[in-house]
């Protein structure tokens, strides 16, 4: 004899955030405390590793479109380690006069670590996106983030995007950036982006990676560093960012 069937999971509402929360128990085992799908992304566990959890952020619908509000909340508990994997990039399509938002909030507890290997974020012609990343790191917490912003699909000039990044370490500002690329005429000026339509970066927060100097590396006022590259095409930049990200990840493993 069986009981009543388990209730079906409630479908995500348009404003529901995707939630990923991981922790490490007293035995050292990593646990996913919460994996909640949102309106646009569903967290899916990958094959486990002994020293971390690996979670894929899988797209569940097309987007971004006008009026969309993608929200992501990630928390890493004390001493825990999380790898976020994006199987594919994200495209903001023609908004036809509207706007959309992409917002991520990251909280990393003492001794926690997050490695986020982001895939390209494409802002198609006609899109207008507000993109916000807020990161809070406790003492001893670390984050490695790879990010690629592409202005336009092939043959397009690209839409409008404004990205704001704010990171705090031990209660103090570590990185505050406001990158306003909403006016194509201004962003294409010499000294801004010029002819480049791809902006790629690797950012380390909570630690300052050692190793050979990079001509486009900026060391932050606290424990952190960033390398940012500009290009007209993606392959060469992606190869350089991949190599740099892997080097910094390896250095982080041995820190």
Swiss-Prot record:
InterPro entries: UreD (IPR002669). GO terms for molecular function: nickel cation binding. It is found in: Cytoplasm. The keyword Coiled coil does not apply. Keywords: Chaperone, Cytoplasm, Nickel insertion. UreD, UreF and UreG form a complex that acts as a GTP-hydrolysis-dependent molecular chaperone, activating the urease apoprotein by helping to assemble the nickel containing metallocenter of UreC. The UreE protein probably delivers the nickel. Belongs to the UreD family. This is Urease accessory protein UreD 1. The lineage of its organism: Bacteria, Bacillati, Actinomycetota, Actinomycetes, Kitasatosporales.
């Amino acid at each position: 004899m069986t009981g009543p069937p388990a209730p079906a999971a409630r479908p995500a509402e348009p404003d529901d955030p995707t939630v990923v929360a991981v922790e490490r128990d007293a035995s050292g085992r990593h646990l996913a405390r919460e994996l909640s799908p949102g309106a646009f992304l569903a967290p899916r566990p990958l094959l486990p590793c002994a020293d971390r959890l690996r979670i894929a952020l899988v797209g569940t619908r097309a987007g971004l479109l006008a009026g969309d509000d993608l929200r992501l909340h990630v928390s890493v508990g004390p001493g825990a380690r999380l790898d976020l994997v994006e199987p594919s990039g994200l495209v903001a399509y023609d908004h036809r006069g509207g706007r959309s938002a992409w917002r991520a909030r990251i909280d990393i507890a003492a001794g926690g670590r997050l490695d986020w290997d982001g895939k390209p974020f494409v802002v198609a012609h006609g899109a207008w996106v507000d993109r916000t990343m807020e990161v809070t790191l406790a003492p001893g917490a670390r984050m490695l983030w790879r990010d690629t912003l592409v202005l336009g699909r092939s043959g397009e000039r690209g839409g409008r995007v404004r990205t704001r990044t704010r990171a705090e370490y031990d209660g103090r500002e570590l990185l505050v950036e406001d990158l306003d690329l909403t006016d194509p005429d201004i962003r294409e000026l010499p000294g801004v982006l010029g002819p480049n339509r791809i902006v790629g970066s690797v950012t380390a927060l909570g630690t300052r990676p050692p190793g050979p100097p990079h001509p486009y590396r900026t060391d932050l006022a606290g424990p952190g560093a960033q390398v940012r590259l500009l290009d007209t095409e993606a392959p060469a930049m992606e190869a350089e960012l991949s190599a740099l990200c892997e080097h910094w990840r390896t250095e982080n493993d041995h820190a």
